[in-house]
Amino acid sequence: MSVHADAIITAGLRPDLFAGRGVLANSKALVFAALIVLVVAGLGFRVTGLSAEGLSEDELNKLNAVADYRAHGLTGANGEHPMLMKACQAVSIILAEKWNNTFLSNPIAPETALRLPTAVVGALSAILIFLITSELFGVEVALIAAALWAFDPSAIGLNRIAKEDSFLVFFFLLANVFWLRGQRAAESTDSSPNKYYWLTAASYGAMVASKYVPHLFAISICYYWMFQGLPETRWRLGKKRLLIFFTIMGLVFLVLSPTVLLPETWRQMGLFAGGKRISHDGYEFMNHLYTQRFSDWLNGIPVYFYLVFTAVKLPLLAVLGFVACLPLLFRRKLGDGRYFILFWFLLWVVAFCFSGGKFTRYYTTILPAVLITSALGIQFAGRWLANRISDSVSLKHYVPAILAVIVIAGSVIDSVNAAPHFRLFLNSIGGGTNWAGYYFPHDEFYDASMRDAIAEIATRARTGARVASESPSLAAYYAERAKRTDLVCISLSDPDAVKQLAVGDYVIVARGRRYFSNDALISTLRDHATPIAELKLGVVPSAKIYELDQSALSNLH
């Protein structure tokens, strides 16, 4: 007697766990309208008050690179990162300048212009999350996942900084939209799937032109590999198509990031790879200092760093949905799309959790997978509740929808309350607002108060006063904007520069900028000096400004 086994064909098959039609599945118009609402509302959260916080030191590097491009053409400025995002930022800044020259009464701040491209691609990512999730798990789960992304305070906060991670995740998602469509075309139609393969390759080229993290491509390859041992599968690229694939990927990368051909770019990448571009010797995590070198591996920032982020930085109901679904990822009834999510988690953990250097912005590339998993958990919980509270078939369709609306509404409320300082959001597990800035102060504050600190000092300081901080280049930039180019901005971690401080000079102690190199000095100021100003982001203390008198100076020296 032979045992019959159903062939694994494509993840696009609806998983048995969610069999049946939901409230929106029968109406393409409603689905389209819902997506438009999610993108527009998500964009609103991401662009409103985009200049409410000052630039970070990292963002200033992007602004300077754009200025260098405009002054000298393509250069190796900020060459450790690819060019695509900076090109978009250059366009945004040029358009903002034209706007400001035309509409003098409503100028666009440099902070807004620089951050706008990442905010836009962040909002558009909701569509890509929907398309991937609908291919894997169905329309209802896809809408929940897209809504969770659109309104998640951490996703919004990460999309509101001018860093490459938002572009990286956008093109990674776009590549896998085409990858999964290619799988469906190969398995279920007689038409050629080649166009989807080439679009996938182009998207991956754009991804690498956004940030040098090519190993994310391994997620798609591992998922593809899962099906290659099955005689029934028609989803096979072959050597020739793979060669064309990588050729397209490489050409698109070169077109979108031609600065990679410059010798200076390779010099900058070499310095970055050797850890010589890391300007500080530590990272504060949960009130403890850790080394921040990638090569420290398990001796650096703890492995559980991103687990803590997941527990405290996502809306509570989204966390519960994620935890509820984790066991489901190992159930066959969830469908073969679960393998894509499992590979996503596995390869991301290997790449990001075991290195010694970590930043919360790296979480951007796994957050869609977390929210998709959460959406699965919410849908499962809704179906489970429906089966227990009603025998009515029609009513059973509405219970999961109502639960999803409750969860999404919770995310909306959290984001409304967190605005415009979304990175400071903590759920009740993390202690809420009272504990904001405790877990990841470097990434939560991200130099946001430096602009206000320099503005305060500019009104007080004598000519030629020194200003010590851990972001001297950023301080100098804002001093120039405040028309105080006479101020001498120095590093708090430079012992020789600190020795030159005199009575009437200033020290800025920003939360998140505590390192091994300045810990003793900051403790001395805290114990023996009184700040002349204390700045806040919303209600959360973010920085202190000290004007040195003879007593404070003697304690420092």
Place the predicted regions along the sequence by residue:
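Short helix- or helix-capping micro-motifs
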Residues: 39-42, 145-150, 157, 177, ...
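Hydrophobic/aromatic-rich transmembrane helices and adjacent perimembrane loops
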Residues: 158-159, 165-168, 207, 216, ...
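Transmembrane-lumen/periplasm boundary regions of multi-pass, lipid-linked membrane glycan transferases
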Residues: 67, 81, 87, 219-337, ...
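Membrane-interface transmembrane helices that cradle and orient dolichyl/undecaprenyl
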Residues: 134-136, 140, 175-197, 207, ...
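Transmembrane-helix signature of polytopic, membrane-embedded enzymes
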Residues: 101-105, 129-151, 170, 188-191, ...
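Transmembrane-helix motifs of polytopic, lipid-linked glycan transferases
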Residues: 40, 112, 116-136, 174, ...
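Short acidic/glycine- and proline-prone juxtamembrane loop motifs at membrane-interface regions
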Residues: 56-57, 81, 154, 160-167
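Aromatic/acidic, Gly/Pro-rich catalytic loop(s) in extracytoplasmic/lumenal soluble domains
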Residues: 488-557
